[in-house]
Amino acid sequence: MKKQNENGRIPEDRLSRANKRKKINTIASILVMTGCLLVLVLVTYVAGILYSWIDSKFQNNANDLAAAAEAGSQTEESTQEVVKTYTQEEVDALIAEAKQQAEDEEENKILSGIRDGLTSGTTMVETLRPYYPNELVVVSNGTFNFVPIRDDLQKNDYVLENLNILEDGEVQYMQDGQVVSHKGIDVSKHQGNIDWTKVAADGVEFAFIRVGLRGYGTEGKLVEDEYFEQNVKGALQAGIKVGVYFYSQAITDEELLEEANLVLEKVKPYNIELPIVFDVEKVSGGKGRANELSVEERTRLTALFCQTIQDAGYKPMIYHNMEMGTLMLDLGQLEQYDKWFAYYNDDLYYPYAYKVWQYSEKGAVDGINEEVDLNIWFGDF
């Protein structure tokens, strides 16, 4: 152990050496710390360079793919197939969205068509009909009815393009450039005195003449048409083929047979070549006594009239309109009887079979001073 001097201090040479060692240690520590900082800075710099290089590569690839997609490139060098996966719920949602979009587009198309139809002056029912090809759109009591077209009923084969409408509104049916229909009228006391010679000269080939009617009030009295005899005689003398009709309001079998027997009695003296027609109509305004009949009751009474006429040796026929044929009669039970159909549009909308078409209630014919119903008979009598 070294001795201290008398003042308790380490001798000068030893102090000097101690200070030198202290300085050396301090310098070494500084150098170590400086080296560590340099290494850290170098690592950070290198990492930054690597990140920039990787990011540049990624960005370049992304730009290449975007450019290729925009240009429509399909090459393997510039694009990769993107595979998307969906859960069942996501697929269902996509389908529902597409379906809703299609429905919205179709709804807008339909609404646009309805708007165009109505603004052009077409009635609502006429506007709706093209959108329901498998149903008959029928207005009854202020409501729109969509009645499925029955496959079990006989259909007519009339072609719209074969209709020939003359300037005066007369309708003809053509085939191979030839008129194959016959011009006809139906009359009652409402037409007054008729010059049947002039009627024939105007091209009328047949006429349905009213025998009578049953009142649609509660009593339902039978009424004979006061012009029946003179109309039948005048038409036959002018060479016009004659059929007859009775406007029924029968609500029981007894009343129905009373009507049929009256008709048979009235036609007995004459040569009636064309059918005897059962005119079954709904009285507007809800006043008709037969309006409340069920479909089954009305169909049964109609069949009873036709069978009675047929049993007497005459040809029966049923007069009806769109409402009656779709909502108020079961035509399936009346298929064996010919039909006379009243419809005042020229679109041949009604699909079921009929031989005679009443196409106007406001016709004009020479020899008749009042408006008269116009008809055509399709094919041969």
Listing of model-derived features with the role each one plays in the protein:
Residues 1, 53, 57-59, 118:
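Short, aromatic- and cysteine-enriched interfacial helices/patches
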Residues 1-27:
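N-terminal Lys/Arg-rich, disordered targeting/topogenic segments
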Residues 9-15, 113-184, 334-381:
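Functionally critical loop-and-helix segments that line ligand-binding/catalytic clefts
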Residues 29-33, 40, 44-48, 52, ...:
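Alpha-helical oligomerization interfaces
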Residues 33-38, 276, 280:
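GH16 jelly-roll
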Residues 57-68:
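Juxtamembrane extracytosolic/periplasmic "stalk" immediately C-terminal to the first targeting helix
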Residues 177, 181-299, 310:
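Substrate-binding cleft of extracellular glycoside hydrolase catalytic domains
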Residues 269-276, 280-381:
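Surface-exposed substrate-engagement region within the catalytic domains
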